[in-house]
Amino acid sequence: MPVRDAEVGDIDEICALIEEHAVYEGRHDLVLDRAEMTKHLFGADPRAWVLLAEPPGAGTVAGFAFCCWNFSTWQGRPGIWLDDLFVRPEYRRHGLGRELLAALRARTAGRVEWDMQEGNEKAVAFYAELGAEPVHGWVRYRWSPS
């Protein structure tokens, strides 16, 4: 399986993937602070982790899953929040997204949850193939610092 846990030496690649994903989604101004991201992923108190997909023989990172733990009080167990899933366009349709999600699924007996932008019909079809379902009746809120 070409999926592995990211290491501190991967920070430039991780940030590049996030920035590429932002451009893909139409946001061209995102530039991440590598030092801040390193602290959050690999510091004394990590807040998230990243899985990287590296196809055999490709010699490059093709995609990633950016995750953190969450907790379901109703299930009484931890799950995984998938904040970002991105496979570079030239590596799509080769099973890497499926392998990244399978690696997440293997890490928890709880739920794996994520958001997606409305209108992404390719993603809807992909997630349905996996057996994932939209959560009807819930609205996501965001409370940003002032």
How would you name each of these model-derived features?
Residues 107-108, 113-124, 142-145:
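Conserved beta-strand-loop-alpha-helix junction that forms the acyl-donor binding cleft
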Residues 75, 88-102, 118-125:
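Conserved glycine-rich acetyl-CoA-binding loop
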Residues 71-82, 92, 110, 136:
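A conserved beta-turn-beta hairpin within the catalytic core of GNAT-like acetyltransferases
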Residues 40-52, 81:
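A short helix-loop-beta-strand connector motif used in the catalytic cores of GNAT acetyltransferases and
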